[in-house]
From Swiss-Prot:
Annotated positions binding Fe cation: 111, 115, 308
MF terms (GO), sorted A to Z: iron ion binding; N(6)-L-threonylcarbamoyladenine synthase activity
Full protein name: tRNA N6-adenosine threonylcarbamoyltransferase
Superkingdom in the source lineage: Bacteria
InterPro entries in UniProt: ATPase_NBD, Gcp-like_dom, KAE1/TsaD, Peptidase_M22_CS, TsaD
UniProt EC number: 2.3.1.234
Family (UniProt): Belongs to the KAE1 / TsaD family.
Compartment list: Cytoplasm
Organism: Bacteroides fragilis (strain ATCC 25285 / DSM 2151 / CCUG 4856 / JCM 11019 / LMG 10263 / NCTC 9343 / Onslow / VPI 2553 / EN-2)
HAMAP family: TsaD
Cited function: Required for the formation of a threonylcarbamoyl group on adenosine at position 37 (t(6)A37) in tRNAs that read codons beginning with adenine. Is involved in the transfer of the threonylcarbamoyl moiety of threonylcarbamoyl-AMP (TC-AMP) to the N6 group of A37, together with TsaE and TsaB. TsaD likely plays a direct catalytic role in this reaction.
Lineage: Bacteria, Pseudomonadati, Bacteroidota, Bacteroidia, Bacteroidales
């Protein structure tokens, strides 16, 4: 008998539903919210309301594209956190009601675990090469920057993480200072492709171990811009490509430096990247360069699996279903939770 999992993701501003059957993805529907662009960031109340409007049609569309009826579902997996509490509650509440009405198990999924296990999403007709355990995963997004030792689907250890800002958060804030709009990551990525990554130098942290820090870079970028604009008020407009390229290169250097140390320290050559910032062209190129230079076997997700999506929640739910790792109706949402 087939195992069919419906995954639901609503941790921030993307409403998503996906269906996985026996480990293979049948559908992955994502509804993004453009309303936040005018505010320069996600407005939690608006995000929650949009999730309420979107969740039913998104789930309906996911089932339709998968060619699956709700009665065929084996379980419903949902994101329990971390994320915006209001947004999470929409997905958690819907998942509970939906599963309860069908009398099928509920599976709570850690959003961060989902990003890591996105590398195990399989699609019909594709190579679907997957990492072998143990492997390292650089999880980097607007809210997280972590180096994770992945020993099994259900056994992960954080080796290092940011002690202040996340990499994506720093990029977004620097983009905002430049007046480039929201979200800043894709804009910086686009401009950086046309700029000189060695045009400007910004400070890098000097902290021991495998932890990250990006607050110093953010401050260095801000103060440098302030000084340059005293001499040329239009400095940003005249040099935005080089600024973006230099900022991106600095962030990538910081990320890869600690990742190299982790790979050497733990003697692991299978290395993956996950999270929203893994869509960044500069970071992807750095991974390919490191693969060639250090003999790494690298795993870079499809662009559709870098940002928040329910496919990663569904595949994690699929693995937990094999272990009968279900949750109760009392399972709460958590705005803050680690791996």
């Amino acid at each position: 008998m087939s195992t069919i999992i419906l995954g639901i993701e609503s941790s921030c501003d993307d409403t998503s539903a996906a269906v996985i059957k026996d480990g293979y993805l049948l559908s992955n529907v994502v509804s993004s919210q453009a309303v936040h662009e005018a505010y320069g960031g996600v407005v939690p109340e608006l995000a929650s309301r949009a999730h309420q409007q979107n969740i039913v049609p998104v789930v309906h569309e996911a089932l339709k594209r998968a060619g699956v009826t709700k009665e065929e579902l084996s379980a419903v997996a949902f994101t329990r956190g971390p994320g915006l509490m209001g947004s999470l509650l929409v997905g958690v509440s819907f998942a509970k009601g939906f599963a309860r009405s069908l009398n099928i198990p509920m599976i709570d999924v850690n959003h961060l675990t989902g990003h890591v296990l996105a590398h195990f999403i399989k699609e019909e007709g594709e190579a679907n090469e997957q990492p072998d355990f143990p492997f390292l995963c650089l999880l980097v997004s607007g809210g997280n920057s972590q180096i994770i030792l992945v020993k099994a689907y259900n056994d992960m250890e954080i080796l290092g993480q940011t002690i202040d800002d996340a990499a994506g958060e720093a990029i977004d804030k620097c983009s905002k200072v430049m007046g480039l709009g929201y979200p800043g990551g894709p804009i910086i990525d686009r401009l950086a492709r046309q700029g000189n990554p060695k045009a400007y130098t910004f400070s890098k942290p000097h902290i021991s171990g495998l932890d990250y820090s990006f607050s110093g870079l953010k401050t260095s970028f801000l103060y440098s811009l302030r000084d340059w604009m005293k001499e040329d008020p239009d400095f940003i407009e005249h040099h935005k490509n080089d600024l973006a390229a230099s900022l991106e290169a600095t962030v990538v250097d910081i990320l890869m430096d600690k990742l190299r140390k982790a790979a050497k320290q733990y003697k692991i050559n299978e290395v993956a990247v996950a999270g929203g910032v893994s869509a960044n062209n500069g970071l992807r190129n750095a991974f390919r360069e490191h693969a060639e230079k250090y003999g790494w076997k690298i795993f870079i997700p499809k662009f559709s699996y870098t940002t928040d999506n329910a496919a990663m929640i569904a595949i994690t739910g699929y693995f937990k279903y094999q272990d009968k790792d279900f949750c109760s109706i009392e399972q709460p949402a958590y705005s803050r939770v680690t791996l």
